Amino acid sequence: MLILTRKVGESLLIGDDISITILNIRGNQVKIGIKAPKDVSVHREEIYQRIKQALEAPHVGE
């Protein structure tokens, strides 16, 4: 795992087309902005896990 330190307004790049910018830091919360191509899915981890579980669940009527 790569660990970086960033200040408000600073960014990091993933590849050539994904940018993550620190927008605000308040207490233990960090607000980030993500710029990515439309074909790249961006989800919070807990939402991604729900989507994954729903796709893996057996469908009713099959």
UniProtKB/Swiss-Prot annotation:
Location (main, coarse): cytoplasm
UniProt KW keywords: Activator, Cytoplasm, Repressor, RNA-binding, Translation regulation
UniProt GO BP: mRNA catabolic process; negative regulation of translational initiation; positive regulation of translational initiation; regulation of carbohydrate metabolic process
GO cellular component: cytosol
GO MF, one annotated term: mRNA 5'-UTR binding
Subcellular location: Cytoplasm
Family membership: Belongs to the CsrA/RsmA family.
HAMAP family the UniProt entry points to: CsrA (MF_00167)
Record note on quaternary structure: Homodimer; the beta-strands of each monomer intercalate to form a hydrophobic core, while the alpha-helices form wings that extend away from the core.
PANTHER family: CARBON STORAGE REGULATOR (PTHR34984:SF1)
Protein's job: A key translational regulator that binds mRNA to regulate translation initiation and/or mRNA stability. Mediates global changes in gene expression, shifting from rapid growth to stress survival by linking envelope stress, the stringent response and the catabolite repression systems. Usually binds in the 5'-UTR; binding at or near the Shine-Dalgarno sequence prevents ribosome-binding, repressing translation, binding elsewhere in the 5'-UTR can activate translation and/or stabilize the mRNA. Its function is antagonized by small RNA(s).
Protein name: Translational regulator CsrA
Organism: Pasteurella multocida (strain Pm70)
Lineage of the organism: Bacteria, Pseudomonadati, Pseudomonadota, Gammaproteobacteria, Pasteurellales
